Amino acid sequence: MELRSELPSVPGAATAAAATATGPPVASVASVAAAAAAAASLPVSVAGGLLRGPPLLLRAAEKYPRTPKCARCRNHGVVSALKGHKRYCRWKDCLCAKCTLIAERQRVMAAQVALRRQQAQEENEARELQLLYGTAEGLALAAANGIIPPRPAYEVFGSVCAADGGGPGAGAPAGTGGGAAGAGGSEAKLQKFDLFPKTLLQAGRPGSPLPPPVKPLSPDGADSGPGTSSPEVRPGSGSENGDGESFSGSPLARASKEAGGSCPGSAGPGGGGEEDSPGSASPLGSESGSEADKEEGEAAPAPGLGGGSGPRQRTPLDILTRVFPGHRRGVLELVLQGCGGDVVQAIEQVLNHHRGGLAAGLGPAAPPDKAAVGAAAAADDAWPSRVDAAAAAAAAAGGPGLPAPLQAGPAAPPHHRPLLAGAMAPGALGSLSSRSAFSPLQPNASHFGADAGAYPLGAPLGLSPLRLAYSAAAAHSRGLAFMAPYSTAGLVPTLGFRPPMDYAFSDLMRDRSAAAAAAVHKEPTYGGGLYGPMVNGAPEKQ
């Protein structure tokens, strides 16, 4: 068709075309011959143009194919082949705008090529691991073991880490302000989880309440510094266990306050001016405050112990204070001294007493009436005189004096004294008639049926040497040897083991009927407190 469109421009082609169109079919042979003659008479350039294909298909057939040229040289008007030219280029260090743009493009292209190579390599390794281990669980296991770097497709544990580490106030140590909460949280999370670090850089939730700053343990505030907090926490702790309570309401703070008021070495200005509220004692299983508060309380030295500024190991007294937060520190210290520093034996003594008090139905949970509270206040006022009388009686009997925590003096205020049921003059002891298997040891001469001056060895206690030896041999496993350092008047702890007279067979089957009858007749009995809440007919405060 293209050939026919260009033929009329040639001389003689019009007549041949007319003859072909108007002539009969016999004359077609002559017309074909005429067209061939006309084509033979065309110039060579026109014939080549008619037979040439599209230029796009003929580009690869050029004599010299296109070779890469140096872009820097092209910017400066010089054409030079790139092969072997990069090192010797005249403008390789040129800093003009065009050369700088070329260098930036080269850097971006190199980074893209490296990234594509790395992605292709990771995909190949992931495909091989999927064939070896199976589904995405195998990929997650390989990512956790460090075989392949963690990618978003493999982080199946990322949500778990975020849920555990992103709790309200989980990373902020109690003792830091709001500005340092994010840094403390990231450090704590990086200590806990190290498999997927990039998911652990976030701090706690923005709407979570932060624990308030820690109050000092004593009024002078010289016991702990700001750098003694420990950021180690457990997952799930923090403000979930007690976000509104500060460290001053925890059992450790109460124990430290009581130690500052009752121990002789800790008396100072303002050391005995604080009084413990009876409603602040928490049960053993639900201690107030968070774990971070407890760790900070352990790291801060107690004011009565005079520790250093760094973290210290727990002393036996601290262990007893944590195990029994409802008891006073001075009382636990006396129990520990009586057990020779053995923490296990001291815990057994306190637990035996608690078990005996619960079985007897006279547990410490029974609230006293108003008259009993008034009698307790009167007993508190008269306590130093009773201690002085007990010390004088012990000195007259020739026995050892009072222990250091029990000596009356200006360092020990009355409301921080340890509660000893026998810390009184021997003449003030009445006839106590509780003789069941769960009754505490009674330091009463009339109870054992012996004269007070019969034997010089046990004169203050009214114990004969025979019965004392028998009771020590028979009840050593139940803690009767605890009497040894306190063999003076009024210093025998009333723990929950049986008195020596109750080892007779006639008394083994007795119950609390005698105690009930004594309660009806208003006879003074020992209750279920650690050292007996009844002294001279007045219940003492626990």
Swiss-Prot record:
Q: Which UniProt keywords apply?
A: DNA-binding, Metal-binding, Nucleus, Zinc
Instruction: Extract the ranges annotated as region (Disordered).
Output: 201-316
Recorded superkingdom: Eukaryota
Q: Which GO terms describe its biological process?
A: cerebral cortex regionalization; dopaminergic neuron differentiation; neuroblast proliferation; neuron fate specification; positive regulation of neuroblast proliferation; regulation of transcription by RNA polymerase II; sex differentiation; skeletal muscle cell differentiation
Q: Which GO terms describe its cellular component?
A: chromatin; nucleus
GO MF terms listed in the record are:
DNA-binding transcription factor activity, RNA polymerase II-specific; identical protein binding; metal ion binding; RNA polymerase II cis-regulatory region sequence-specific DNA binding; sequence-specific double-stranded DNA binding
Cite the record's tissue specificity text: Expressed in testis.
Presence of the UniProt keyword Ligase in the record: no
Function description: May be involved in sexual development.
Instruction: Describe the family membership recorded for this protein in Swiss-Prot or TrEMBL.
Output: Belongs to the DMRT family.
What is the official name of this protein in its record?
A: Doublesex- and mab-3-related transcription factor A2
Q: Which gene encodes it?
A: DMRTA2
